[in-house]
Amino acid sequence: MIVINMTMKYFLFILIFFSAFSCMEPNNENLWNLNKIAGIDTEGYCRDVYVSGDSVFVAAGQAGIQLWDISTITSPRLVWKRSLSDLGLNKEISQVEYKSSIRQLFALESNERPIHIDLSIPDSVNVLGQFSSEKTKEFRVKTNNTNSFTVYAADNDDGLKSSTFEYDSFYKLWFNTSGNEISSIGNPNGIDIISDLIVLTLDQLGIQAFQYENSIINSLYHIDLPGNARAITISDTDEYYVACEDEGAFKIVSNYPDHAPVKMQFGEDLYVTHVAISSNQIALSCAANGISLYDRISNDNIESRGIHNIGYVYHAEFYNNYLFAASREGLQIFQID
């Protein structure tokens, strides 16, 4: 039989008391604050955002496409909007991308084909139509010069697709002059590009890298990852961040072709759909869990700086020291402290 005297009872009570309060009030000194600067009611779910100067292009889901002016960041002003019927589409808009050098806007009808919109004439929104193939999950646009661009698409059926357009000054039209289709080892659902490097996410099969050289696209390597590789953000030619849904996120240093890739997992207890990075700041889009912030302390150390429940977040982007969050609650603009 164990006898607990009054002194032992006292110390046991103190231990339980402080343990309880340490759980109730965690140490917040290393957490970052999200200060909300502005919120935009996008009518439909805000699925994606692309910022160019004072212009913010919004993929507003069932509400179509919108352009907002943020020259006064605390009071965004709607410049124009186009509904699905205006665009001649049926499904929600899931992505937007704008190229200021050629004043062309591109959007994606969810799981369908990209759409091309000409904004080169002031106060005019000229819908030029859709191109490439159905089952496009995501795309990237690369300008070749002021009269040419190439769209690279992650096609969930056929792999990596490219479509090159050139402007004919006589007809004043953009013509699709060439295209290519490169098979991948799995069905792509995400893409990113830097320089001549193209990387696809392949759901349960990780990622696959390609190189564009002398008008030819060749497969370079494949990296397997746990979970479902959903989206990729390339920060450098050999450093990538991959959102892997239930497995959180991975930082990958490829080391190609000399060494095996180095993988660092973080946010593994979260459901991650996208990774945004700016210098040492990392923002994970975590669907119903909002935004999770991380600090890239060093090449091999990434530390959590807190989870912020701001609603259901699809995608986030850093721009000019602001964080733009595309969410079901609309577009939200923050500063990190």
Can you say where each PLM-predicted feature lies in the sequence?
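Positively charged n-region of N-terminal signal peptides that target proteins for export
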Residues: 2-11
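Feature marking well-ordered beta-strand scaffolds used for ligand recognition
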Residues: 23-337
